[in-house]
Amino acid sequence: ADSVVLLAQDYHVVQIVYDGHGETGEDFISVETTVDEVTDWLQAHSITRLNAAYGCSLGGACLTRFLALGKIPVERAVIDAGITPYRMPLILRRLACLRDDLGFRLIAKSRKVLETVYPPERWTMPGRDPVKEYDALAAYLKTYSKRTVRNIFWSANNYTLPTKPAETGCQ
């Protein structure tokens, strides 16, 4: 969030908050639905190109699909730890989704597990209070509905891409 404030001093910034990640109470449905909604919103606001786009994790998956569809040109893109669809049999994809779903629930339920899997001394930014950071993170993880968690893990690993991605010249 600090980077958004800094960038907004010199650029017009659009920050996407996906369903299931904010305070709307709506569940996340899919990468495809999210990308369609973002594209529709940008077009409705007469945004016909983007100078830059950034996506991390699920955001990287959404940005990957957004770029592949090529409905709105993007000059530069950064995909950080972006998720691409699995290329394995359905049964293995279902087992991976179950593993991820159960792992998330365990981390969200137990502060001890959260801190064991993601040690605060490694994941807390310098100068920040790890107790406050992890209090906020633990509270935030509890806001996800079971449906949102399941849909995120299923969709992020199984979304569709066009057979031939759009040629946009994005760097």
Q: Residues of each region from the PLM?
A:
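Active-site loop/oxyanion-hole signature of alpha/beta-hydrolase fold enzymes
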Residues: 15-54
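Conserved HGGG/HGGXW glycine-rich cap/lid loop of the alpha/beta-hydrolase fold
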Residues: 1-23
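Gly/Ala-rich beta-loop-alpha elbow adjacent to hydrolase catalytic centers
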Residues: 54-63
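Flexible "cap/lid" loop of the alpha/beta hydrolase fold
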Residues: 68, 74-106
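Glycine/Thr-rich phosphate-binding loops of Rossmann-like dinucleotide-binding domains
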Residues: 24, 63-64, 87-88
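Active-site signature of alpha/beta-hydrolase-fold catalytic machinery across serine-
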Residues: 2, 65-69
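Conserved alpha/beta-hydrolase catalytic His-Asp/Glu region
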Residues: 88-89, 108-166
